[in-house]
Amino acid sequence: MAYEASLIEKKWQKIWDENEYFEPKDDLNLPKKYILSMFPYPSGRIHMGHVRNYTIGDALARYYRKIGFNVLHPIGFDSFGMPAENAAIKHKIHPKSWTYENIAYMKKELFSLGFSFSKKRMLATSDPLYTKFEQEIFIKMFEKGLIYTKEANVNWCEQDQTVLANEQVEDGKCWRCGHEVVQKKMPGYYVKITAYAEKLLKDLEGLRDKWPNQVLTMQENWIGKSEGLAFSLNLDEKSKQKAKESSLEVFTTRADTIYGVSYVALAPEHKIVQNLLLQNLLNQDVLNKIKAIQNQSPRERQSSEKEGYFLGIYAIHPLSGEKIPLWVANFVLSDYGSGAVMAVPAHDERDFEFAKKYNLAIKQVIQTQENLPYTQKLGKLIHSQEFDNLDCNEARLKIISQFEAKNIGKRVVNFKIRDWGVSRQRYWGAPIPMIKCQSCGIAPQKLENLPITLPEDVQITGEGNPLDKHPTWKNCICPKCGKEAQKESDTLDTFFESSWYFARFASDEKTWQEKALDEKSVKYWMSVDQYIGGIEHAILHLLYARFFQKALRDLGYLTQNEPFDRLLTQGMVLKDGAKMSKSKGNVVDPDEIIEKYGADTARLFMLFAAPPAKELEWNDDAVEGAYRFICKLYDRAQNIKKGELVELKQENLNKEEKYARLKVYEALKKSEEVYHQSFAFNTLIAACMEALNALALCKNEALEQEAFYIILNILEPIIPHVCFELSEELFKCKNFKKLELKEEVFVKDTLNLAVSINGKKRAEFKISSSASKEEILAFAKENTAKWLEGKSIVKEIYVEGKLVNLVIK
């Protein structure tokens, strides 16, 4: 009987669905595993990146179910976002219709691959019920002071007509549409992620060896903790008159280099720069260039060529009394430190590059034979008055102490991470649950009025905010004074939705109507035991999710400190050496692969072609190879004896049979290591192939039966449909269970022993593993007879299973 993938897969998907095989059990006393792959945006079709991600997660979920764990393996859709509005403009379809039509199609695709997702806990973040509790969380954060409003320069995408977080600007362009991003001053809501900066940094330590080092490093750098000295610099008298300021605050992490300062660099937004602009004390050329710098995103400023302009004013060095020129520079950010940086060109690469470009003084204050800039924090100070000959660290501490004693400076800790702006000027997002009242200012909506839903009668044109233009939707009553007011017309950044969905999944779905999170089930299921997704989310979703977990804990919603215990970042799926994309014409449609070869073939290829963390190059021949392997497995199963397993006696097997059985059990042993630690599914599949090849040389009916029983068990998480089919056909099994290793299989028939005389190796021999110590010693003497001739043995040493040492004289 030929292998018919479509019939087998549809049969088992129906059985699994009807019997709710993949729903988590209600018994919260069972050992649990929460396996979660990052949920998709409903773009309309799944792609091969999705197939790889979800196949990895599904293999783990199926394995842990099989060995007795209560498994939560949910899926949902990150369904708000700009693409729905873009589709509305392009195809003249409502964003909601476009989104939910896509969700329906993608559900069908996902389940056609046999993924063992919980259907009862499936959600879309655009569902009103999800929005209701997201708005509740927003209000609780606002009341706790974790969300606030301010007017600030924001990253503005002209194409999408919306604000972007710093993390969403890539090389000066919008991460979503690729359009140039400009700076624009706007009011908005901000999440106070900086309040958790220290905790976010410190708690990375608990994730070491469980998260990829690259992700940990990226988060450390993004949080960017620096400890240093904040101090005042007085302006000289003439400069005070021009700048309308008497001093400025400066921050440095290198107080030991204080005597090497040759200029101070200010951010364009610094108050002194703005005062000079207001008084028209800077020429038009400088004015234009300052505006150009202000229009750059923070990331652009720090990555572009260093540029600056002398402001014509000076500060006084607080220790030496020397005059220091003040410059405006593009690499200084207004919201880091004080927006002013003391520049030490001799000991900082950026400052050195700037000083060389503008011919500024370079003052060496650390002794070194190396070329400047010398940036290491090692060496003795020079040209630093009473601090000469001190090493850098000692000098740094003493200089800070002197500043504190003179009351002109203090030790401070700064972080690079900025508060997260979450206001977006778009329609298809969760409405921000706030109102604007002329009498009361801004105020949160009453919880009983949630969810604040979107109006459906809108015109999506791509110009401006549709909610702002709606004739009636904004009108409301102020919850404080009862007067007429207006709803906030901005919607939330979609990363807000994906920052807590994992906790919603962990809540018993029977409680979803009543509460955001069910304490009992969340306490049981969280944290996620294994999270799987792309490394591109390292400082976006993963950082926000970690913040949300801590904030929700402090708000009393849950108890765990971190959302994800272990993280696997899978590599991209490439074709012709490039990421699959329609523009490159190198897309492979999963539906076509499933139709031609079946879901199991697609799954097998995804896990066999490369280790999960590495990039995977699509290969049509390798897909064919995966299909042939399944066909061969199916064909060979037709010759296996059906019925109950016959017990095998290891001692009754011949050499070839023992070897084949050993290979089968080695694969079973490897499965434990692969599923629990390495995720090297490719090596596990290879081990199964090796076992089947060894088995082909044997004609032992009982051995073949046992081997197939074990190999189907090993491969079930990877190619579940065909394994369930063959297991039912051969063994009347409709489910899989944990298998135990048989230690006697691993016992070697022969021992390879070395013989040493007076510690020097003289011979090697093979002997039966069942031989006694006396037999082994006799055989050792026989093999070394020529060295023993005329000698007497004074001591015989046998190290079991390894060597014999004879001491002679």
Curated annotation (Swiss-Prot):
Gene Ontology, cellular component aspect: cytosol
Reactions that this protein is recorded to catalyse: tRNA(Leu) + L-leucine + ATP = L-leucyl-tRNA(Leu) + AMP + diphosphate
Coiled-coil region(s): none
Principal localisation: cytoplasm
PROSITE patterns listed in its UniProt record: AA_TRNA_LIGASE_I
Binding of ATP, residues: 582
UniProt xrefs under HAMAP family: Leu_tRNA_synth_B (MF_00049_B)
Annotated protein name in UniProt: Leucine--tRNA ligase
Organism of derivation: Campylobacter jejuni subsp. doylei (strain ATCC BAA-1458 / RM4099 / 269.97)
